[in-house]
Structures are given as C-alpha cells and as structure tokens.
Amino acid sequence: MAAQTAATTTRESLGSLILMIYTFTSVVDADTFASGLGSNVKGFWANSESAETAGDEGVNVTNSAGTFTLNLKTTGAVTLYVLATI
C-alpha cells in the first residue's frame, strides 16, 4: 500500500456539487489517495483504464473522510470520480 498522487485532476461544476476527476497512471492494490475533501464527499466511483486479464477486471474504492483506498487485482491506470460539495 502506498500513497498516490493524481497525474491529472479535473474539476467540473454540477450545480450545487462539483465532480472531481483524478487520474492515476499506476495503482497497486490497496493504494490510498488523500483528496482533502473530508466529509464533503457525497458519492464516488472508479474505473480501471488498463487492458486487464479476464477475471481480473474492475476496481473497488472505499472512502474514509476523503481518503480513498483503491483495491484492484492488477496494477494499472485508474480514474477516480468524486462528487462533493465545497
């Protein structure tokens, strides 16, 4: 497990919410990312962007006070989407 830094960050306005899009170039299972959003997070999901082996697809993400843990079976690029209020 290691702390990740986003390669790119995009911020989009969605009315009363913002959509933060974080792109990571190489994530290993159980890596973490501290977004700094704290309890402002309202929803989140992630997509794996690498060519994955059948049976190893997908990424699971959990949130604890704005720190996200990314769990996946293979190492690869991941995009994290976070809906938040600021």
Sequence positions of predicted segments:
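Extracellular attachment/recognition segments
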Residues: 2-86
